Amino acid sequence: EIPLRLVGSEMCIRDSYSEMKEFFPNNHVEYFVSYYDYYQPEAYVPKTDTYIEKDSALNEQIDRMRNAATRNILENNDVIIVASVSCIYGLGDVESYAAMTLPLAVGDNVEPRDVYKRLTELQYERNQTNFVRSTFRVQGDTLDIFPAHYEDRAWRISFFGDEIDDIYEFDSLTGKKTASLQKVTVYPANHYVTPRPAISQAITGIRKELAETVENFKNNNKLLEAQRIEQRTRFDLEMLETTGHCKGIENYSRYLTGRKPGEPPPTLFEYLPPNALIFIDESHISVPQIGGMFRGDYNRKKTLSEYGFRLPSCVCLLYT
């Protein structure tokens, strides 16, 4: 069983995390909260005709901890998750996330270029000069990978032709070897990573809804809204086709995860096993808070769809 402790207050969650680490020193105690230092959601105010573009500042440390949390849920049984109410927001599909992993083992026969390509598909960036989290670099027959869940450690993969000859862990700052490894598994750098076939299928569904939405706006003499939704969605589709990602990709979650209209999006709860235990701290505060988050998100997205900033399917992206 994997326990999840849901804490309503962002201030109290740090204390809860420290307590769990102290009570269970031999367990994988993980921290899962919103990874934004600053977050301004996309919104539209009809009264003043004001469109507010999504703006945010990502906290790298918390993003690393979120990646460590989902990875350990899938790999270990001794995991305890301390989470804030933000865990009810949509997260990438767990099946796609797990399917996109890249296992590497000593003795594997694999073309190095194929490994580089797969890392790019996992949203890892090739960077020869600035070796940081979620990047990789190549030096001759050596590949260095800085996993998304690590803070100061990385992996070195040595090739001999098309065979993996050696794998070891090293300190990312000093380069000192810290452990010899027989195998590693690289998890996606982003929870919204989606396999290419799923992206192609999603694009087909998005185009169909776009055509229906444009026609509906035109039939109701809402020409500005029709032009707006067509222009914005087509740009997103181009980005999805070329890079597999786009700004505001969470608004297309229904298609990327293959859900039906009205079905809730995957969240952290989908990553947990069926026998997981969930504890809600101060439920008299946390539960109403969740309800308020639901209503606020619903109204915001409904307005965006009514005025042609987003497709109607974005309103389905509500948490359970």
Model-found features: residue ranges?
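Single conserved hydrophobic/aromatic residue that forms the stacking wall/gate
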Residues: E1-G8, I13, Y319
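Hydrophobic/aromatic pocket-lining and membrane-interface residues
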Residues: R5, M20, V82
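Conserved Walker A/P-loop ATP-binding site and its immediately adjacent core
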Residues: S9-M20, Y36
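Conserved RecA-like helicase motor-core motifs
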Residues: N26-S34
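N-terminal cationic and glycine-rich segments that engage phosphates or anionic surfaces
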Residues: Y35, Y39-I81, V85-L318
